[in-house]
Amino acid sequence: MKTSLRLEDGTKNSLQIPIDLIIEIFLRLSVNSIARCRCVSKQWASTLSRPYFTELFLTRSLARPKLLFAYRKGSDYLFLSSPQLQNPDDDHKKSSPVVVNYHMHHILTLGSGNMSWRTIQCCIPHRSFDGGICIDGLIYYYAGVNNNDIVIVCFDVRSEEFRFIIGALHHGSLINYNGKLSLYLPSTVYSRFNGVIRSIKLWVLEDAKRQEWSEHTYILPAMHDIMKTTDLRCVGMTQTKEFVFWSIKGMRFYVFYYNIERNTIKKVEMQGMEAFKESNVYTFLDHVEDVKLMQFF
């Protein structure tokens, strides 16, 4: 690939830049920047649409997952992302069911060529709650059945079948623990997490068919100086076995990382979010950018 530089005497000097270097520069850009670069020229559009580049971009993106913040104000949403700390102690996929009523469910499969909603049936009428999670193609979420009995629903996006985990031990936050469904429970009646909490429990679903759970208890380090009495919400667990919590305290937004192996707490301030302190905020882990999805829109 060639580029031209204008010298002081007004002449131009064409430079040959290795394509590998160009690709490496593009790989460091965000999806939004890649979209703009595709509009620069046909050559750039061709280069950035090649399978080699899109696969390599996804591989790099998987190695550096991000935190995704979604702000809701009225009917409007604003999405922001921030690098997800991979080692905080050193400072440093898609179908989704949408419940319409007790009996009907709609799904939309991205990338299938047929961008339309389809209706599927479920054998047990239920009403879904917030806080679902997707693990290896299985979507888990809480739901109410019969007289508002609480169950965990498992929807397989491949077979489009529903399964039910009846008699869930506790109504805790659904998180991904080493590829297994887990329930996070702080040691309080009100399921709050703050600086005075001394331990947390994790129930791990070891066998979905037999509905067998294992219990894990973690004794927390002294952390009142870091968290005070601020109530936090559990976002989930990273692939490096770190619980992630978030909280808005006054004008500031904080993310806390608890490493269960090192038994340490790390507090990170997310700057630039002061304008959204009065908005409803949703935080998601392991956000990965994929430039291949831009080809469908």
Swiss-Prot record:
Domain of life, per lineage: Eukaryota
Listed SUPFAM superfamilies: F-box domain
Listed Gene3D superfamilies: 1.20.1280.50
InterPro entries named among the record's database cross-references: F-box-assoc_dom_typ3, F-box-assoc_interact_dom, F-box-like_dom_sf, F-box_dom
Disulfide bridge map: none
Domain F-box: 11-60
CDD domains linked to this entry: F-box_AtFBW1-like
Protein name in the entry: Putative F-box protein At2g19630
Naturally occurring in which organism (per UniProt): Arabidopsis thaliana (Mouse-ear cress)
